[in-house]
């Protein structure tokens, strides 16, 4: 079992600006300056230095926090200028020595998290009117160029030395792991033959050629670089756009600070617990209370005043942290049981009020955040079974936004009792899309369009039989069969190969068309993960293993 990261102190994903070691953020009206100034001694794990603005998971945890806080705490920002605080280098990408000494699981989780952060930058540009500009004031290599590719525009310093490059294939025997190849051809629309040349040219490309090949949007001489980049940023910030309504007063994201128990993390609205012997975990999400519903039904100003304590924001921040904990600190957990608790009617009332206010900038950010957390669940390599049964005195609350958990799960078991109900809201109809753009309801009923059309616009609660007939339930069980049938399903799932299940689930969850984002996770990431375990990369004589050493790699020349 690949469990080395668990022998280290557990990774915590919560941070705040007072704890940043690697990023500097400043503000000038609608323009934010985000400088990457990585502390070489600030690695998350011992054994490597973060030289040349290279990054590890700790650097990216801070970046993810910056991106999210810009959206919630600084809605006045229209442009984010991303540059380097280190002379002559923008970013050297992921730290190669960190990758070389890491387990396969650590590399995979690291790349997945960095991919999600880059996607969140693009999401901010698309839906929060925060345009990211990369000001590559130095060498921009590998993951550094991939970071720039996540920005809407890229500007390169023309000084005879600064270049953009993706040297992973020629130097390391791996792929650019953070979306580079996909964004090169799908986003920047670089011709694929030119992309082939670029991706096998270790030194990359500079100046006019980089601009001619559309690898960057412009090149400026060193003497004018800062001036020209800021001129462009000011032009974007001044461009007239139709902003969402609502006074642009930021909402501070305070800590969520779970209570830690021996086998659990207890949040206000979420509980994560685990059983290592059974290799299972449970995530319980409690629905909104009557008081929570009263807040959202009071309108835009009341929702904004609730700030980070708004149920929809707080609960999904807690769920996000729980998912990241499972991914990184609990590698031996293979099956996650998703449960909800509360009043499904209150969830529907909550969703209706939130949907009615969705044109307010803060509500838009809350909904976008909910969507990103649910996509994190979709992309998590664990089996998920949603269990809609009565636990203690609590009723299941799989309705509206919490029904998304059941629709995201690989299976949904529902207890057939009169008091158990599920329901749909406007949020199930595209407000919380998957990474490839479909709603989970549309993905669930992709092969049954008549059932899908019948559910569109349907509101209110339905009993277990009606939900089953509508195609929302995998298995409907009565009280007599529930305990035995779910126990056997859980035991069977836990006995199967985790590798095979990861591949199977990734193929079955994302029906329908692909887009740039889904290609990054389904194609680029899958190939990268395979290459990571091949001897040509990570064997004793592989290119990644020997990077920085005097020996040359020895390849197995057989194509697979």
PLM feature spans:
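CoA-thioester-processing core
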Residues: 141-196, 393, 399-454
């Amino acid at each position: 079992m690949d469990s080395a990261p668990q022998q280290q102190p557990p990774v915590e994903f919560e941070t705040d600006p007072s704890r940043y070691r690697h990023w500097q953020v400043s503000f000038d009206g609608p323009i934010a300056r985000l400088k990457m100034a990585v502390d070489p001694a600030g690695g998350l794990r011992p054994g490597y230095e973060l030289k040349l603005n290279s990054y590890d998971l700790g650097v990216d945890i801070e970046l993810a926090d910056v991106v999210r806080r810009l959206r919630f705490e600084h809605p006045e920002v229209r442009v984010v200028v991303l540059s380097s605080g280190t002379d002559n280098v923008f970013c050297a990408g992921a730290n190669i020595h960190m990758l070389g000494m890491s387990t396969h699981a650590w590399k995979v989780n690291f790349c997945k998290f960095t991919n999600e952060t880059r996607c969140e930058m693009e999401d901010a540009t698309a839906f929060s009117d925060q345009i990211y500009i990369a000001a590559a004031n130095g060498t921009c290599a590998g993951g550094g160029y991939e970071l720039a590719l996540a920005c809407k525009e890229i500007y390169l310093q023309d000084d005879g030395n600064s270049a953009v490059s993706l040297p992973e294939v020629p130097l390391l025997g791996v792929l650019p792991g953070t979306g580079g190849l996909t964004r090169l051809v799908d986003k920047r629309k670089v011709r694929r033959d030119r992309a082939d040349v670029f991706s096998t040219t270790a030194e990359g490309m500079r100046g006019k050629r980089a601009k001619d090949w559309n690898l960057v949007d412009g090149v400026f001489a060193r003497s004018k670089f800062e001036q020209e980049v800021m001129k462009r940023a000011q032009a974007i910030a001044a461009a007239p756009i139709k902003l969402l309504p609502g006074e642009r007063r930021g909402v501070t994201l305070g800590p969520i600070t779970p209570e830690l128990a021996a086998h659990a993390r207890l949040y206000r609205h979420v509980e994560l617990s685990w059983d290592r012997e059974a290799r299972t975990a449970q995530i319980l999400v409690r629905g909104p209370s009557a008081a929570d519903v009263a807040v959202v039904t009071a309108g835009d100003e009341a929702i904004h005043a609730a700030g980070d304590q708004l149920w929809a924001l707080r609960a999904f921040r807690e769920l996000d942290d729980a998912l990241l904990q499972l991914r990184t600190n609990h590698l031996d957990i293979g099956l996650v049981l998703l449960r909800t608790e509360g009043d499904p009617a209150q969830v529907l009332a909550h969703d209706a009020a939130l949907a009615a206010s969705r044109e307010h900038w803060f509500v838009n950010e809350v909904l976008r955040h909910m969507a990103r957390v649910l996509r994190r669940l979709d992309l998590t390599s664990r089996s998920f079974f949603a269990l809609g049964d009565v636990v203690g005195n609590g009723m299941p609350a799989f309705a509206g936004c919490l029904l998304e958990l059941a629709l995201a799960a690989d299976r949904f078991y529902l207890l057939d009792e009169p008091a158990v109900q599920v329901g749909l809201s406007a949020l199930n109809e595209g407000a919380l899309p998957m990474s490839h753009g479909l709603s989970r309801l549309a993905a669930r009923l992709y092969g049954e369009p008549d059932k899908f059309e019948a559910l569109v616009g349907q509101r209110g609660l339905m009993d277990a039989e009606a939900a089953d007939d509508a195609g929302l339930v995998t298995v409907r069980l009565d009280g007599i069969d529930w305990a035995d049938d779910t126990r056997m399903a859980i035991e069977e799932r836990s006995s199967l190969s985790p590798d095979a299940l990861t591949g199977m689930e990734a193929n079955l969850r994302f029906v329908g068309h692909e887009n740039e984002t889904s290609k990054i996770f389904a194609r680029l990431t899958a190939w990268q993960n395979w290459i990571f375990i091949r001897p040509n990369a990570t064997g004793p004589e592989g290119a990644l293993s020997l990077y920085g050493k005097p020996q040359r790699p020895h390849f197995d020349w057989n194509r697979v």
